[in-house]
UniProtKB/Swiss-Prot annotation:
EC number of the protein: 2.7.8.7
Enzyme kind, highest EC tier: transferase
Pfam families, sorted: ACPS
GO molecular function: holo-[acyl-carrier-protein] synthase activity; magnesium ion binding
Cellular location(s): Cytoplasm
Catalyzed reactions: apo-[ACP] + CoA = holo-[ACP] + adenosine 3',5'-bisphosphate + H(+)
Organism of derivation: Mycoplasma genitalium (strain ATCC 33530 / DSM 19775 / NCTC 10195 / G37)
Entry cofactors: Mg(2+)
Name under which the protein is recorded: Holo-[acyl-carrier-protein] synthase
InterPro entries: 4-PPantetheinyl_Trfase_dom, 4-PPantetheinyl_Trfase_dom_sf, ACPS, Ppantetheine-prot_Trfase_dom
GO biological process entries: fatty acid biosynthetic process
Family recorded in the similarity comment: Belongs to the P-Pant transferase superfamily. AcpS family.
Keyword Chaperone: no
C-alpha cells in the first residue's frame, strides 16, 4: 500500500555556493558515512553530492512526513547503480533521481510492507 509520494527539485548552483562558503550545511544534512564520502570529493563533485542527497532526503521527508524523519538519520547509498535508503522496517522507499546541467530532481514512493 502506498503511504506517500514526495518530490523535490533544486538548482545545482545553489549547492556550489554552499560548498564554496561553508561545511555547516553538509554537516547538518549528511550522516557520518555520507560525510566520509563527501570529504573525498572536489567542490563540483561535492555540490552534486549535496544536491542529490538534499533532493532525495526532501522527497523522502515529504513522502513520510507523518513519521517526521530526521535528515541525519536517513542514509542514502547506491546499490547496483540505484539510490537506496534504509528507513524503518515496515516501509519500503522507491527512489529516483534525474539530472540536467542546472537542476537535480528526486522522487520517492513510500510503500507499507505487508
Amino acid at each position: 500500500m502506498v503511504v506517500g509520494i514526495g518530490i523535490d527539485v533544486v538548482q545545482l548552483k545553489r549547492f556550489l555556493t554552499l560548498v564554496e562558503t561553508s561545511d555547516c550545511f553538509a554537516k547538518r544534512l549528511l550522516t557520518s558515512n555520507e560525510l566520509n564520502s563527501y570529504w573525498k570529493l572536489n567542490n563540483n563533485q561535492r555540490a552534486n553530492f549535496l544536491a542529490v542527497h538534499w533532493t532525495l532526503k526532501e522527497a523522502i521527508y515529504k513522502a513520510t512526513s507523518h513519521i517526521k524523519p530526521l535528515f541525519t538519520k536517513l542514509e542514502i547509498y547506491k546499490l547496483n547503480n540505484q539510490y537506496r535508503c534504509e528507513f524503518i522496517q515496515n516501509i519500503n522507499l522507491l527512489l529516483s533521481v534525474s539530472y540536467t546541467n542546472c537542476h537535480v530532481s528526486a522522487i520517492c514512493l513510500a510503500q507499507q510492507n505487508g
